[in-house]
Amino acid sequence: MAGPGPTFPLHRLVWANRHRELEAALHSHQHDIEQEDPRGRTPLELAVSLGNLESVRVLLRHNANVGKENRQGWAVLQEAVSTGDPEMVQLVLQYRDYQRATQRLAGIPELLNKLRQAPDFYVEMKWEFTSWVPLVSKMCPSDVYRVWKRGESLRVDTSLLGFEHMTWQRGRRSFIFKGQEAGALVMEVDHDRQVVHVETLGLTLQEPETLLAAMRPSEEHVASRLTSPIVSTHLDTRNVAFERNKCGIWGWRSEKMETVSGYEAKVYSATNVELVTRTRTEHLSDQDKSRSKAGKTPFQSFLGMAQQHSSHTGAPVQQAASPTNPTAISPEEYFDPNFSLESRNIGRPIEMSSKVQRFKATLWLSEEHPLSLGDQVTPIIDLMAISNAHFAKLRDFITLRLPPGFPVKIEIPLFHVLNARITFSNLCGCDEPLSSVWVPAPSSAVAASGNPFPCEVDPTVFEVPNGYSVLGMERNEPLRDEDDDLLQFAIQQSLLEAGTEAEQVTVWEALTNTRPGARPPPQATVYEEQLQLERALQESLQLSTEPRGPGSPPRTPPAPGPPSFEEQLRLALELSSREQEERERRGQQEEEDLQRILQLSLTEH
């Protein structure tokens, strides 16, 4: 039998799972570990698809890229989940988070160095999560990211930490980045616990074994992935086009202008923005598939989204086949670039559904705004995108070739039912003064520096607050895959109308429905009130659901049970539809009245 051929030597060793020879070949440093075979797979992607755990372990030890996607847009971790192997998923997930952490170590000093050249400033980024579904819109939160920049130092304050276990995670945190000659200092300040976690990021990774061990996922996390569909959501902006919005009627239509945060802005629509969601279920048991379908069908039928189901229908399974090579593809066939596999493939046969929905993103661009998107704002978004999935989506959008001007406001889709609206405001405290920021006198050196909006930032905002405990970075918070959790939460909330879960919606209303532009109470007081409100509601819900003992006082007979989810949804949609029709009728009536007035005014002259 012939040995490995001269082409794709690492891939051929992976195919045969000859992991000891693979280890030796990698130690020689003579082969490209990221080389793609004729089917577009790297050695790691091939090893995962074939389920060759020993080869996967060797490649990961040699730092094969876990974050790479194949030609179909699936990441290595998603392919690992499709194998259904818990050990494979645990290993790939651990190294994925480890590689993200090391990239963070290398990237932060470079981003801070970029910021050093830019003028100092303070700005607020207001994030509002909105929805066109009436019931979902009630639970959408909002948050204001407050950003201070001075030299190589950056501070970002937030109270909306993320989304986990079907709830929005809140807490008062500050993220402080301070550039240094040999790297950077990162501080995460937890104002609720008065604790500061400090991490020094050098140009070289310290104690990689310790960091790798800290990234090991729990068994519950692995089990959750293996019993849930694989979901991929991304914005397809390949055909995006920007158009000026118009206002007015008939021959008086003009390009739309709006004032945002005190700046005149041109309003653009980004068309042909497609939100693509693909779901794979080949790794699920029949019970898990039934549970998944039962949770999604009413909502999907309500949205009316175009959905396509596809499954592998390749050649019949042959006697010599294995579960990861069901059509018995030979290595000679696989590695021959001129041989067509047609519908045959390696790996478990794919069961996938896909949804495509077109959206319009909206931008408000001001050519008068003094901030620079590339020099001042993009590095900050890059920093926050390391640990925040929403900032990562914003970064992907603003890196497009935008029309001229600074985006003072952006509205982009995050999921099929959720949009994010980001507004930049209070530049250098011009709207609401802050003690930590001031505009220098005209005679000062800062004012004479040529900066179109000179600003001085108090250096003490980048220091550890008095009385706080300082700890090392004992824990890690890798970038969360929030998309699927958020989508499922939106589905759950969209089906609610009455009962205890409706009171949970009231919690979010109480937490987030603040009047824009109003001066808020002190942040600590507001947050404490939020916690007390949530605790009180949780206790009341528990009391309402606890079983009653024999000696308990009689309770008022319960009202008839609430209708089914489908019935709730139908009623909610009917109400929403009637309201929408009424709004359209009023708008049409106003338009007709205006046209009659204009016609009369023209005939009189």
UniProtKB/Swiss-Prot annotation:
Ubiquitin-binding protein that specifically recognizes and binds 'Lys-63'-linked ubiquitin. Does not bind 'Lys-48'-linked ubiquitin. Positively regulates the internalization of ligand-activated EGFR by binding to the Ub moiety of ubiquitinated EGFR at the cell membrane. Keywords: ANK repeat, Cell membrane, Endosome, Membrane, Phosphoprotein, Repeat. It comes from the Eukaryota. Residues 319-328 have a biased composition (Polar residues). Residues 564-575 have a biased composition (Low complexity). Residues 550-563 have a biased composition (Pro residues). GO terms for cellular component: cytoplasm; late endosome; perinuclear region of cytoplasm; plasma membrane. It is found in: Cell membrane; Late endosome. The gene is ANKRD13D. InterPro entries: ANKRD13, ANKRD13_C, Ankyrin_rpt, Ankyrin_rpt-contain_sf, UIM_dom. Residues 306-333, 541-605 are annotated as: Disordered. The modification Phosphoserine is found at S552. One of its GO terms (molecular function) is ubiquitin-modified protein reader activity. The lineage of its organism: Eukaryota, Metazoa, Chordata, Craniata, Vertebrata. It comes from Homo sapiens. ANK repeats lie at residues 39-68, 72-101. Residues 576-589 have a biased composition (Basic and acidic residues). Residues 482-501, 528-547, 564-583, 589-605 form the UIM domain. GO terms for biological process: negative regulation of receptor internalization. Pfam families: Ank_2, ANKRD13_C. PANTHER family: ANKYRIN REPEAT DOMAIN-CONTAINING PROTEIN 13, ANKYRIN REPEAT DOMAIN-CONTAINING PROTEIN 13D. This is Ankyrin repeat domain-containing protein 13D.
